Regions:
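Nucleic-acid endo/exonuclease domains
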Residues: 1-111
Length: 111
């Protein structure tokens, strides 16, 4: 199965679950497209890219944006599972951050 088809299945899954996404590379020139992700989910700050020659540099540059790479060996089911795990990890990290901030505010107000 082609990687573009896997990306379309992932987009279908995102639509089904009402998760907003953007496809920034479709509007770009060929040079800029090389450096951009194929799909971006702003709510969870997740970047998705189809595997190619530039992927390693892209991964290092976008490491803080929770990168997900679509490889030739991935099945659509595995890709969706990988996306679910990434979304879950981001949500847990956000919750930890909010709880930490809430604790800071409480200790500050108790002084």
């Amino acid at each position: 199965m082609k990687n573009e088809t896997k990306l379309k299945k992932l987009v279908g899954w995102l639509d089904k679950n009402n998760i907003e996404y953007r496809c920034p590379s479709k509007e770009m020139s060929k040079y800029k497209r090389k450096k951009r992700s194929d799909l971006f989910i702003p709510k969870f700050v997740i970047s998705v890219r189809i595997d190619d020659d530039y992927t390693q540099k892209w991964y290092r540059a976008h490491y803080d944006m929770n990168p997900v790479v679509i490889r030739d060996t991935d099945t659509p089911r595995f890709l969706i599972k990988k996306m679910q795990n990434t979304i879950t990890r981001v949500m847990v990290n956000q919750q930890k951050y909010y709880m930490k901030e809430h604790d800071k505010k409480e200790t500050k107000s108790n002084r």
